[in-house]
Amino acid sequence: MNQQYPSTLLEKAVGEFSKLPGIGRKTAMRLVLHLLRQDTSVVEAFGSSIITLKHEVKYCKVCHNISDTETCQICANPQRDASMVCVVENIRDVMAVEATQQYRGLYHVLGGVISPMDGVGPGDLQIESLVRRVAEGGINEVILALSTTMEGDTTNFYIYRKLEKMGVKLSVLARGVSIGDELEYTDEITLGRSIVNRTTFTGTV
């Protein structure tokens, strides 16, 4: 046991919390000590919610967004514009775009971007399922709303090459989103304007 910790159980709990993104050991310690001060019922409810999430959450069979059912609420909503599909990197980006209240179409979650340095290729992403969605018909515009990074631009170009002859309009967000920024960290007003003022994608990286 590390002499810094009075209990091996405490040390183990801190170690597990510190594995979470953005959580260092000091923050992990505060979280663990906070839980220790709570009633047993509160801690059990917290643990149960995490376990239930892991075992029962589903991914939408259409867009790959997180859902409680086979088809997510957005895809199942007849009031959404099914002729538009906004392609995003991850589920957090869906939430970011929804928060702008400037988009009423559907989504397609890739699950990442092409990144050879990280060992992520096109086959690791939900690109082929996007191609199949477009091929099924009914989609007039695909909005490429990926992060303005080299990896995001590379992914945009790859998708462009896959869809360019399929008769759909391909557009990208207006450059209100700064180069190098990830979508989820862009403020709602800027992101909303970038969606409204989106431009046709010309196939350049």
UniProtKB/Swiss-Prot annotation:
Give every Toprim domain span.
Answer: 83-178
Where are zinc fingers of the kind C4-type found along the chain? Answer: 60-75
Please name one Pfam family that this protein belongs to: RecR_ZnF
A GO molecular-function descriptor: zinc ion binding
- Entry keyword Protease: no
The keyword Membrane belongs to this UniProt entry's keyword annotation? no
- What family is reported? Belongs to the RecR family.
Q: Which NCBIfam families match?
A: recR (TIGR00615)
Q: Which HAMAP family match?
A: RecR (MF_00017)
Annotated function: May play a role in DNA repair. It seems to be involved in an RecBC-independent recombinational process of DNA repair. It may act with RecF and RecO.
Record-given protein name: Recombination protein RecR
Could you tell me the gene encoding this protein? recR
